C-alpha cells in the first residue's frame, strides 16, 4: 500500500493525523511506543511538528518495519486514506478545544481512541460494554498507561465485535 505496510487484516491498524506536539499527547505515545509495537498493531502517522517527535517516528519506522509507517509531511489526500483504512484513530490530546480529526474518523467509521478533554469529550461517546452503545473509546487522565490500556481494550472489543459487526454501531 502507499503507507508502506503490508495489508494484514489480523493487525489492528491505528491512525494518527496530527501536528506532532506535546499538546496533542505525543509524549504519551513516545513513552509507550515499544510496548505498542509488541501488540498486533500497525501504526500510521501523518504530520509534522516538533523535531523530537518527527525523529521518534522515523526511528520506530526503521526499528519496526511493516508495523510503523512514519509520514512526516502533510497531505490532505493521504489523511483521508488513513481515516478510511484504519481500524482506530488515536488522539490522546492534553487539551483540544474543538478537534476535527475525531469527527472525520467517526464519519469514516474508524473508532476514535481519545482522551476526555474539550471537544473530544463532547463528541466521542465512550463504549458501554453492558448495552453495546458508544462511538469510540476514551480515557480520563493524562497518563501513558491509561492510554495503552484503552488501546488494548479497544482492540479486544473490536475483534469481539468484528464477528457480529452488523448488529452494533461499534
What are these regions, as identified by a protein language model?
Residues 1-8:
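Donor nucleotide-sugar binding/catalytic pocket of nucleotide-sugar-dependent glycosyltransferases
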Residues 21-34:
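A conserved mid-protein helix/loop that constitutes part of the nucleotide-sugar donor-binding site
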Residues 8-23:
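Conserved donor-binding/catalytic core segment of Leloir-type glycosyltransferases
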Residues 7, 40, 44-81, 138:
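Nucleotide-activated donor-binding/catalytic signature segment of Leloir-type glycosyltransferases, i.e.
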Residues 19, 46-48, 73, 115-117, ...:
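Cofactor-binding loop segments of dinucleotide-utilizing enzymes, especially the Rossmann-like FAD-
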